[in-house]
Amino acid sequence: MDRRISGSTQLLGLIGDPVAHSLSPAMHNAALAAMGEDYCYVPFPVAAERLAVAVAGLAAIGVRGFNVTIPHKQAILPLLSQVEARAAAVGAVNTVYALPEGGWGGTNTDIDGFVQPLLGLEKGIPTLILGSGGAARAAIQGCLELGLGPVRVAGRSPEKLRALQQTWPQVETLSWAELDRHLAETRLLVNTTPVGMHKPGSLAELSPLSWEQLRLLPAGATVYDLVYVPDPTPLLRMAAELGHTPIGGLEMLIHQGAKALSLWLGGKLVPVEVMRQAARQQLAQIGDPNS
């Protein structure tokens, strides 16, 4: 399809620092082309100290909506006119949309992306989340919305664990040393830590849990790693070898993007498979995306 940009082309985008290796432009522009929409999705590198002026600038030039990635997901909250309740609970926004009356609204489609591969799971299954950072917050909210539980979170930062329990009192928090005693009943294991991520000089061949720990999971457990480079991660390779069901983090990225794009386009059906193919092609080319 001819993708000429004209005076009528509408702008969407991504702000973060860095954004050069993001898969989002490839995914969104492929979907927009397939849908015949006169939109263009552009990555905008925005340093932390320039966030407020950048957000004002996007409004001034008529951008219809944009995604938000590291390091702005929390910092953008006070710059928005309204924030949806689930995003406020998580304390982070990753999708921003123009309001009819002016200003910006914010939501968190990371939650939607997280839950999409889990929709077939039965409710009430014991769930263990590894990590206590921003990704863990989206995972907790998603698990609770799906009716999974009990939901437990294991982390290394007592301060972050306390903050999680203040937001979600029904969630049990564990020190890293305590997690082994819960593995035998864990039907869904979620890694939200960066361990296993392929980056220069890195933790690429590491896993947040050992082979011996993964063997403690019940037969047929689901293991979900939000890391997607490499694919599969060491954690997912071991999980598959042990007969568990592996889910890679690329699905979360694709589905959060699809949800955001549908929101910007007024609820239109988005070609998820087109986005998946574009993401995989881009991933094969760059190898080490940042978002």
Swiss-Prot record:
Q: Which SUPFAM superfamilies match?
A: Aminoacid dehydrogenase-like, N-terminal domain, NAD(P)-binding Rossmann-fold domains
Q: Name one GO cellular component term.
A: cytosol
Known catalysed reaction(s)? shikimate + NADP(+) = 3-dehydroshikimate + NADPH + H(+)
Q: In which pathway does it act?
A: Metabolic intermediate biosynthesis; chorismate biosynthesis; chorismate from D-erythrose 4-phosphate and phosphoenolpyruvate: step 4/7
Its Enzyme Commission number(s) read 1.1.1.25
- Keyword line: Amino-acid biosynthesis, Aromatic amino acid biosynthesis, NADP, Oxidoreductase
**Superkingdom of origin organism:** Bacteria
Spell out the catalytic residues: K73
Similarity annotation:
Belongs to the shikimate dehydrogenase family.
Q: What does this protein do?
A: Involved in the biosynthesis of the chorismate, which leads to the biosynthesis of aromatic amino acids. Catalyzes the reversible NADPH linked reduction of 3-dehydroshikimate (DHSA) to yield shikimate (SA).
UniProt protein name = Shikimate dehydrogenase (NADP(+))
Query: Which species does the entry assign this protein to?
Result: Synechococcus sp. (strain JA-3-3Ab) (Cyanobacteria bacterium Yellowstone A-Prime)
